[in-house]
Amino acid sequence: MLEIRNVTCIRDERVLFERLNFTISDGELIQIEGQNGAGKTTLLRIIAGLGYADEGDIFWKNESIKQNREEFHSDLLFLGHHTGVKRELTAFENLAFYQSMHDNYNEAAIWDALARVGLAGREDVAAGQLSAGQQRRVALARLWLSNHKLWILDEPLTAIDKQGVKVLEKLFMDHAKQGGIVLLTTHQDLFIDSNELKKIRLGE
């Protein structure tokens, strides 16, 4: 369970959000909505422990992430605007490196993940030679390799075609059905039943 308790964020003397409270239970898929500048990315970074709140705290499994940072990060997969893809490595090598960091190397799973994001035939191309959209697909392929319970995804559908969006939507729903938590922002319309997708709107 993820809890956001009384979180206030002020940037450049402007209040982005104030005394924000909500709880996300295991098995939930949540979309953060709001106008540009409402603080969606800032909120995701605060929840992920990558940014600071002026007031309030984030709790994971009933403990503050400040006191439980190691376990929290072991449960977290965060994908932000910066993909974290290493330009000098191939698409395959990037995912192999990601798996090696988590002591979970599986070559067949890497090939499968790259195929699922539409990069079959591009596995051995250096990431620096891929388009920005293809680099983002490399980053998204980590989702198929992840055993993290909490996914925090900032605009994961950027530069993804309609078929790719459908594939990712199914992945998000499957992760939630297996007891995981997906927290995301997107400017695209999601074709997910309202019973399976909850929305939290900032700026209102």
Swiss-Prot record:
<dbReference type="Pfam" id="PF00005">
    <property type="entry name" value="ABC_tran"/>
</dbReference>
<keyword id="KW-0067">ATP-binding</keyword>
<protein>
    <recommendedName>
        <fullName>Cytochrome c biogenesis ATP-binding export protein CcmA</fullName>
        <ecNumber>7.6.2.5</ecNumber>
    </recommendedName>
</protein>
<dbReference type="GO" id="GO:0005886">
    <property type="term" value="C:plasma membrane"/>
</dbReference>
<dbReference type="InterPro" id="IPR003439">
    <property type="entry name" value="ABC_transporter-like_ATP-bd"/>
</dbReference>
<dbReference type="GO" id="GO:0015439">
    <property type="term" value="F:ABC-type heme transporter activity"/>
</dbReference>
<keyword id="KW-0472">Membrane</keyword>
<dbReference type="InterPro" id="IPR027417">
    <property type="entry name" value="P-loop_NTPase"/>
</dbReference>
<dbReference type="GO" id="GO:0016887">
    <property type="term" value="F:ATP hydrolysis activity"/>
</dbReference>
<keyword id="KW-0201">Cytochrome c-type biogenesis</keyword>
<keyword id="KW-0547">Nucleotide-binding</keyword>
<dbReference type="InterPro" id="IPR005895">
    <property type="entry name" value="ABC_transptr_haem_export_CcmA"/>
</dbReference>
<dbReference type="InterPro" id="IPR003593">
    <property type="entry name" value="AAA+_ATPase"/>
</dbReference>
<feature type="domain" description="ABC transporter">
    <location>
        <begin position="2"/>
        <end position="202"/>
    </location>
</feature>
<comment type="similarity">
    <text>Belongs to the ABC transporter superfamily. CcmA exporter (TC 3.A.1.107) family.</text>
</comment>
<dbReference type="GO" id="GO:0017004">
    <property type="term" value="P:cytochrome complex assembly"/>
</dbReference>
<keyword id="KW-0997">Cell inner membrane</keyword>
<keyword id="KW-0813">Transport</keyword>
<feature type="binding site">
    <location>
        <begin position="34"/>
        <end position="41"/>
    </location>
    <ligand>
        <name>ATP</name>
    </ligand>
</feature>
<keyword id="KW-1278">Translocase</keyword>
<keyword id="KW-1003">Cell membrane</keyword>
<comment type="function">
    <text>Part of the ABC transporter complex CcmAB involved in the biogenesis of c-type cytochromes; once thought to export heme, this seems not to be the case, but its exact role is uncertain. Responsible for energy coupling to the transport system.</text>
</comment>
<dbReference type="InterPro" id="IPR017871">
    <property type="entry name" value="ABC_transporter-like_CS"/>
</dbReference>
<comment type="subunit">
    <text>The complex is composed of two ATP-binding proteins (CcmA) and two transmembrane proteins (CcmB).</text>
</comment>
<dbReference type="GO" id="GO:0005524">
    <property type="term" value="F:ATP binding"/>
</dbReference>
